[in-house]
Design a protein with these regions (language model features):
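Conserved SAM-binding strand-loop segment of SAM-dependent methyltransferases
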Residues: 7-20
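Helix-to-beta-strand junctions that scaffold the AdoMet/dcAdoMet cofactor pocket
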Residues: 40-41, 54-56
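Conserved catalytic/acceptor-binding region of the Class I
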Residues: 44-45, 51, 59-132, 148
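Core SAM-dependent methyltransferase catalytic element
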Residues: 114-117, 134, 138-143, 184-194
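C-terminal helical/coil "lid" or tail adjacent to the Rossmann-like core of SAM-dependent
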Residues: 120-178
Length: 194
């Protein structure tokens, strides 16, 4: 709502590549990201650039995913694909992607190296839910996340793809309550001072 009427809230909104955008030095009083920072090719450079854009003493805040083992939305589909295909799948590590900052120590070190202070990483246990049908949810899981990556790695036949999809549908039915399909989730809520 605020973006559709920025004049009414006295705020400017900027959508840009934080790694390469030439920001006005200390031009912002706050930097916020919701699950976007994990995709930087060079996180150190990106966080340095963000820090230069935030007024001294002001904050950067973001949320990102905790480890795969604490996130059913990633782990459950991955396990399903591994069980059905037998594919060997290694965790993605620090490469750009949803779990790039799932290692708290690594995340903390990147922010400190980029010269942020008062780095705080809170662990938040929550859940994520969708009102999608079990079929639509299964289709989504076939296209994103760790299950999708394992599918790409396994390169299964159409018959095996259908088996995976049906397993996703069955899992969705087990998770569905009151019209919602839910997954346990753990995220990091991060704040750091420029």
């Amino acid at each position: 709502l605020a973006r559709s009427h920025p004049e009414s809230v006295g705020k400017d909104f900027l959508q840009a590549d934080a790694q390469s955008c030439k920001f006005e030095p200390e031009g912002f009083d706050l930097a916020i990201s919701r699950f976007g920072v994990m995709f930087f090719e060079n996180p150190f450079k990106a966080f340095q650039n963000i820090k230069s854009a935030v007024q001294k003493g002001r904050e950067m805040r973001f949320v990102c995913w905790a480890p795969i083992s604490a996130n059913d939305f990633f782990l459950s589909p991955l396990n399903t694909v591994v069980d059905i295909t037998g594919v060997s799948f290694a965790e993605p590590g620090k490469e750009p992607g949803p779990l790039a900052f799932s290692d708290r120590t690594y995340l903390y070190s990147i922010l400190k190296t980029a010269e942020f202070s008062s780095v705080n990483i809170d662990v938040i246990e929550t859940s994520i839910s969708t009102k999608d049908s079990v079929e639509k949810n299964a289709s989504l899981l076939m296209e994103i996340g760790m299950g999708f990556r394992a599918i790409k790695e396994a390169a299964p036949t159409d018959e095996v793809l259908n088996e995976i999809r049906e397993a996703f549908v069955a899992d969705g039915k087990k998770r569905q309550k009151n019209g919602l399909i839910s997954y346990d989730a753990t995220i990091y809520r991060v704040s750091a001072v420029a």
